[in-house]
């Protein structure tokens, strides 16, 4: 009997297998095949071998002796060398379609056929999506919860049990190096509970350190007992059942002989898994007359001793993860810290298979999050999640209940034929009854936009290139530095911060796009993926230093490393977490929904006397001294505000000064504490120096977490808040928060939930405003041309994701005040943005500011030297150096200076050389290196310019992107626009008028721009700039070969 076949999700063209069998090998059919195949194959690297990657070209359901799925697959980017993968048994339920990427485990038959069945092989769907073992284990009972937990990672609220569990993990892990004696355990417990590490969490949960210490001490005898039972007693005294596939008798005596690592971080692109193993231990196993050593994962649990399927599943998954670093452990250990009882968990095929199938389901729902319309329109809608389970009791205590109900009501109830259990409909309705139609629509739209943006960043800059590309390939893109060895000892800065120094095994550090502050992942060259991660501290010609979260000091000295740039996903989890909080049923969220979604008008009090103490008049008058009129108006509006104030801060108008003055004045408001959230690193640092007294600095300061604190002498004038039951050290923190009132660069730290006034710069994404949930009123200080992150999907911009919070709220004009008096730029530089952006509203604060010029003490000597060497080709140089010419645009059209496109990006070598030579001339004229700043929109150009400066002892000359200069200024700014071509290529970076405005407003005394006028004139915003520069005679046409006749 012939098998019956039904095709599933075929590509638009004929079936590829049939086409291969029937084609006459004529040229047109081969072209048709190539077109069909290439349309399906995504732009990703495919390969065979241990870490194979196949692309699915076709899926066919076959009914013979039983249901099967036949997958036509290829490891060729051109679609050649087709292979067949047969899914049998319960693997046929796998959601899979043409274009999907898979990894196969098992044996491929001689006829290039893979068989994945109940007994043989595994298939990993989307293996480059690494999913944690915890998420997979939680998906056993409710897959929907696991999907939501991956999306809304910041929504799980902390609890007493979770905090104490974390502390107990910490104590046990530290004891692995210190010992498990009673005295050591007591010392570790005291240090953990009373130290600063968990102070903020205890404060947030209103916990007393004495009570916490009491709970922790209940576990310590079990720690000691476990160590005696499984570390010090003779091998044959304590037996646990260890069932391993290669073992016979399951009863084996087990002894932990050595601890090799704690919190071992492992990425496994082979199985699509990631995780941190609590403890990695060398275990001595005795069976009958033989004994042998195994390296096993040891999972710690602090809750009830349940030996549950979820707990055991995590251990099974860790046995798979361990194969990335060593041989298959075949089993793992599960230890319950409350009792000291330990169980062996075998990593048998049945459990591994079922868990990998759950992982595949998770990856399907995490990847296929949107539906594109089938009717030819561009409409994109959200897809449904795994079905709700019909278990009210389980849902009642689920941490994702709110998000589950939100998604069901706002998204799934709008999808035709989406199944929702009848008994769960009332539960969903009750959980979301406080939300109206507009709120649900807002949630649906922002979830869609965040999802599209996150998917775009994952596909463009996903971390998969770290394991799919060699270090040499990544070096060509400027995203990696390979062939490194560690030099010198590792310096431990603090817990989780270890300073490492690397140098090239042979030669110097290659030119790279990696810069100070970039996040990196450190791996071995040939193996050991993601050993550690952290941030680059410094890149030099001969070495590179990094601050990493794990010490690599115990690894072999001759081990070769690679440093890969790791681009984040744009904070998707943070945005979705904030979106979820905005929808919660609480007074603060209700107020925010009314202001942000319903556009309720903000409220103001009528008189300052109602918000300031009666004796504060003289103090306020003294504070306001030196402020200009717009700044004083802004101060008054903020003090009168009950909801929010919007401050338009134009470039150089004293936004930082305004913030500092606001903070000082808010000290005087009864019971008012203040958070200041500013993503501009330089401005945040400058402001924290001004407020060195009375500040708490929590957050990322040049990518290094640190806390500095002092109390203000004026804080005694304000009343303390009611203190929770916390210990003396907690009270110190609370006194600091409620007394000194200022928190710089918080970015929404949970500790500060009792603060009730927030001042922050409006970044471009509305959903970044987590600190809003801790306020009763807030002030947005917004530079209307401030450049935030560029959205990579035009559809996302069209849907409205580029809308800032300020833009959304400014329809209520009574809340808006403008700062228009600037102290930075001289009048000619200011005229550029005033003409192009501000419609003449910007004004200089004084004649001194207006007429200021760059100070070049040796300019006369240099000009005499230039006259002596004068040539027709370099006449323009004198005009550029002249202090009384603050604005110069150097047109490179005639040189010519064409751009170069490389894997690492776009650069312009001639512009880079001109920038370098001009900088040397300014230095020779007496300008200080720290007063010169160089800006380019492309990282590749920064790399080229930096290469020139490697030979110049002028390290203080800063070379950076436009975005890095936000909130900062220099006396001299040189801008390289880079783009110069004859084929009309533009790109997106120079199309953004906000980024252009930032570049134009960084210079105080001298602004020099380099670019090709015909090319740049294709950009609308730059065309307007060039027209203005022409009208003012600021454009200098450089002669042919100008870069070859520079007098340096």
Curated annotation (Swiss-Prot):
Localization terms from the record: Nucleus; Mitochondrion
Function in brief: Key enzyme involved in DNA replication and DNA repair in nucleus and mitochondrion. Involved in Okazaki fragments processing by cleaving long flaps that escape fen1: flaps that are longer than 27 nucleotides are coated by replication protein A complex (RPA), leading to recruit dna2 which cleaves the flap until it is too short to bind RPA and becomes a substrate for FEN1. Also involved in 5'-end resection of DNA during double-strand break (DSB) repair by mediating the cleavage of 5'-ssDNA, while the 3'-ssDNA cleavage is prevented by the presence of RPA.
Name of the featured protein: DNA replication ATP-dependent helicase/nuclease DNA2
Superkingdom, taxonomy of origin: Eukaryota
Region Disordered, annotated ranges: 683-724
Gene Ontology cellular component annotations, sorted alphabetically: mitochondrion; nucleus
Region Nuclease activity: start-end pairs: 86-521
Species this chain originates from: Xenopus tropicalis
């Amino acid at each position: 009997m012939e098998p019956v076949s039904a095709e599933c999700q075929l590509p638009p063209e004929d079936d590829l297998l049939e086409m291969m069998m029937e084609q006459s090998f004529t040229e047109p059919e081969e072209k048709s095949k190539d077109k069909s195949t290439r349309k399906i194959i995504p732009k990703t690297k495919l390969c065979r071998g241990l870490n194979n990657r196949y692309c699915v070209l076709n899926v066919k359901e076959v009914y013979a002796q039983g249901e099967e799925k036949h997958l036509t697959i290829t490891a060729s980017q051109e679609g050649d060398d087709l292979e067949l993968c047969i899914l049998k048994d319960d693997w046929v339920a796998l959601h899979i379609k043409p274009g999907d990427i898979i990894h196969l485990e098992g044996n491929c038959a001689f006829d290039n056929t893979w068989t994945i069945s109940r007994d043989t092989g595994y298939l990993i769907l989307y293996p480059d999506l690494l999913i944690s073992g915890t998420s997979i284990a939680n998906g056993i009972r409710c897959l929907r919860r696991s999907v939501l937990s991956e999306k809304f990672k910041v929504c799980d609220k902390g609890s007493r049990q979770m905090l104490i569990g974390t502390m107990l993990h910490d104590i046990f892990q530290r004891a692995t190096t210190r010992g498990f004696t009673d005295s050591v355990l007591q010392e570790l417990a005291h240090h953990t509970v009373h130290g600063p590490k968990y102070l903020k969490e205890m404060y947030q949960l209103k916990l007393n350190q004495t009570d916490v210490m009491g709970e922790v001490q209940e576990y310590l005898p079990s720690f000691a007992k476990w160590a005696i039972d499984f570390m010090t007693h003779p091998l044959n005294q304590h037996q646990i059942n260890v069932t391993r596939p290669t073992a016979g008798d399951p009863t084996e005596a087990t002894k932990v002989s050595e601890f090799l690592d704690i919190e071992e971080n492992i990425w496994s692109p082979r199985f699509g898994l990631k995780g941190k193993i609590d403890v990695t231990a060398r275990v001595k196993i005795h069976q009958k007359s033989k004994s042998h050593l195994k390296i096993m994962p040891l999972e710690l649990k602090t809750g009830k001793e349940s030996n549950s399927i979820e707990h055991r599943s995590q251990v099974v998954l860790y046995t798979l993860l361990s194969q990335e670093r060593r041989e298959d452990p075949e089993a793992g250990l599960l230890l319950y810290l409350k009792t000291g009882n330990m169980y062996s968990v075998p990593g048998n095929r049945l459990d591994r298979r079922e868990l990998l199938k759950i992982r595949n389901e998770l990856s399907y729902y995490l990847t296929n999050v949107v539906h594109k319309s089938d009717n030819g329109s561009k409409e994109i809608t959200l897809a449904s999640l795994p079905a709700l389970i019909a278990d009210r009791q389980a849902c009642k205590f689920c941490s994702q209940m709110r998000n589950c109900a939100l998604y069901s009501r706002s998204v799934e109830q709008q999808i035709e034929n989406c199944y929702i259990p009848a008994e769960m409909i009332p539960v969903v309705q009750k959980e979301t009854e406080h939300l109206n139609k507009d709120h649900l629509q807002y949630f649906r739209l922002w979830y869609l936009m965040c999802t599209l943006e996150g998917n775009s960043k994952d596909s463009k800059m996903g971390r998969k290139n770290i394991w799919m590309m060699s270090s040499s390939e990544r070096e060509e893109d400027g995203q990696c530095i390979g062939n490194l060895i560690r030099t010198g000892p590792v310096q431990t800065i603090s817990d989780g911060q270890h300073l490492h120094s690397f140098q090239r095994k042979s030669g110097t550090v290659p030119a790279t796009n990696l810069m100070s502050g970039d996040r990196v992942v450190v791996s071995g060259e040939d193996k050991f993926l993601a050993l550690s991660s952290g941030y680059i501290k410094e890149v030099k010609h001969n070495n590179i230093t990094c601050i990493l979260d794990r010490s690599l000091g115990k690894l072999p000295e001759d081990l070769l490393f690679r440093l890969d740039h790791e681009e984040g996903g744009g904070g998707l989890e943070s945005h979705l977490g904030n979106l979820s909080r905005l929808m919660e049923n609480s007074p603060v969220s209700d107020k925010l929904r009314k202001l942000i979604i319903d556009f309720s008008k903000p409220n103001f009090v009528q008189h300052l006397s109602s918000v300031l103490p009666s004796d504060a008049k003289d103090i306020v008058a003294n504070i306001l001294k030196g402020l200009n009129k717009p700044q004083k108006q802004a101060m008054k509006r903020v003090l009168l505000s009950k909801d929010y104030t919007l401050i338009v801060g134009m470039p150089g108008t004293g936004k930082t000064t305004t913030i500092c003055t606001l903070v000082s004045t808010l000290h005087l408001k009864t019971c008012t504490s203040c958070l200041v959230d500013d993503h501009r690193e330089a401005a945040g640092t400058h402001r924290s120096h001004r407020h060195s007294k009375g500040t708490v600095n929590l957050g990322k300061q040049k990518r290094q977490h640190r806390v500095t604190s002092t109390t203000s002498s004026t804080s005694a004038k304000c009343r303390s808040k009611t203190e929770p039951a916390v210990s003396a050290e907690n009270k110190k923190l609370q006194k600091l928060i409620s007394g000194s009132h200022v928190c710089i660069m918080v970015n929404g730290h949970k500790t500060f939930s009792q603060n009730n006034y927030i001042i922050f710069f409006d970044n471009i994404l509305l959903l970044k405003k987590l600190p809003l949930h801790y306020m009763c009123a807030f002030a947005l200080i917004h530079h209307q041309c401030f450049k935030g992150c560029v959205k990579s999907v035009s559809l996302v911009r069209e849907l409205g994701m580029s809308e800032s919070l300020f833009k959304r709220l400014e329809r209520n004009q009574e809340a808006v005040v403008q700062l228009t008096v600037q102290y930075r730029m001289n009048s000619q530089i200011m005229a550029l943005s005033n003409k192009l952006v501000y419609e003449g509203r910007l004004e200089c604060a004084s004649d001194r500011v207006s007429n200021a010029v760059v100070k070049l003490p040796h300019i006369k000597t240099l000009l005499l030297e230039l006259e002596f060497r004068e040539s027709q080709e370099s006449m323009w140089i004198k005009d550029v150096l002249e202090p009384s010419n603050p604005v110069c645009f150097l047109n490179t059209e005639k040189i010519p200076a064409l751009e170069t496109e490389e894997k690492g990006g776009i650069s312009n070598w001639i512009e880079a050389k001109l920038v370098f030579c001009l900088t040397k001339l300014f230095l020779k004229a007496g300008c200080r290196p720290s007063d010169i700043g160089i800006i380019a929109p492309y990282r590749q150009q920064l790399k080229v310019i930096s290469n020139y400066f490697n030979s110049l002892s002028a390290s203080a000359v800063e070379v950076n992107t436009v975005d890095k200069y936000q909130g900062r200024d220099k006396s001299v700014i040189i801008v390289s626009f880079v783009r110069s071509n004859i084929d009309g290529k533009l790109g997106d970076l120079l199309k953004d008028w906000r980024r252009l405005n930032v570049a134009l407003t960084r210079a105080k005394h001298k602004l020099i721009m380099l670019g090709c006028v015909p090319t740049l004139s294709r950009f609308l915003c730059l065309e307007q700039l060039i027209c203005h520069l022409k009208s003012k005679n600021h454009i200098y046409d450089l002669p042919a070969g100008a870069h070859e006749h520079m007098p340096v």
